[in-house]
Amino acid sequence: MIFGKTHFLSYNILRYSTKRWMNRHSYSHHAKCTVAQLLKQNLLTFENQRIQPEEELKENLTKVVNYFQAPIDVAVGYGSGVFRQAGYSQKENPMIDFIFQVEDPVKWHKINLQQNPSHYSFVKNFGPGFVSTLQESFGTGVYYNTHVEVEGNIIKYGVTSKKDVYEDLKNWNTMYLAGRFQKPVVILKGEDEFYKENSYNLSSALHVGLLMLADRFTEFDLYKTIVSLSYLGDIRMSFFAENPRKVENIVSKQIAFFRKLYLPLLYAEPGVHFIESSEVLKSMDPSDNSRYLSFHQNITKDSISRLLNGLPLNLVKILGLKPDTSSFEKCAELMLTNQISTRSLLISKSIKKLTSFSILTQSIKGIFTAGVIRSFVYVYAKLKKGLLSKWGR
């Protein structure tokens, strides 16, 4: 398909029609709920991950997923097209992002190439086997089709395998998928299968966040730290291809969802203490972003060692640790003698080392999978948003 004037016209029309539900979409799971109730969510049933959108939004997202004839095991909606971010006007309607976990990538692309050949760039000419190889052997194990029309929406969807999803969530092989799923997402299909694996990922993100923070911190500090992890090796942040205030915008607009995800984990974390009284927690609305909860964590050799023991395998390796108690204890003792800024810098550099190469190769792969013109449109939109955010509208 030629991405010319006709497509630009239809794209603008779709952006306008999409805003009818985008401007109204909201989430219902916080109705008549307090922060105190969020703390008591059942982590064994993954209650903290079950974010339920309003029916109108859920129907629209589900309609997109059901459009595809190729079988999808797990479907995830994420990003600013699903969750509003601060800094967007009501006239702006971001592209809707999806991740599709599939059982057999070759079979999936074969069916999808027959149904949606226009979604693919010139690589479709080499067949589903080549597409699948490009997906799994280069970058982050995800193949994206971007700026395509599905059921009246402009979407981007990434296709990945079960193996790549689970390895990244548990071990942070590239942290590409894990980083996205550390933020609020909507699971449209395959909930229980996904939640179990992502629980490891959320705990890992929390442990990293605590290691990078001082003994006293606010929940806003914690959520910003967690969100920033996936952007540490992202070259787009260096070249203004992302909003420089993106992290703050995500947290401030989605505070209720971050509280739902992480407050029960904090509540169950040994050595972390809520400073606010129980009366405050019982009266506080999860959506209230006019104030943030404060915490105190015990920073001792034992507490640091325990947090290190909860890190994913690949980060442990990059930190130069062996997965045994004595190695964690030695590192904890060293971290304890250094300032918090030194400890935070060490972890930041390690995560950047973990993510930067895979993000770079994924970006290069995107030029081929999206095609030159679609890639230009995508990068232009990112640059425009990033530069406008830096210098003002």
Swiss-Prot record:
The keyword Membrane applies. GO terms for molecular function: cardiolipin binding; phosphatidate cytidylyltransferase activity; phosphatidic acid binding. Its main location: mitochondrion. Its EC number is 2.7.7.41. Its cofactor is Mg(2+). Keywords: Lipid biosynthesis, Lipid metabolism, Magnesium, Membrane, Mitochondrion, Mitochondrion inner membrane, Nucleotidyltransferase, Phospholipid biosynthesis, Phospholipid metabolism, Transferase. GO terms for cellular component: extrinsic component of mitochondrial inner membrane; mitochondrial matrix; mitochondrion. It is found in: Mitochondrion inner membrane. The keyword Nucleotidyltransferase applies. It is a peripheral membrane protein. It catalyses: a 1,2-diacyl-sn-glycero-3-phosphate + CTP + H(+) = a CDP-1,2-diacyl-sn-glycerol + diphosphate. Belongs to the TAM41 family. This is Phosphatidate cytidylyltransferase, mitochondrial.
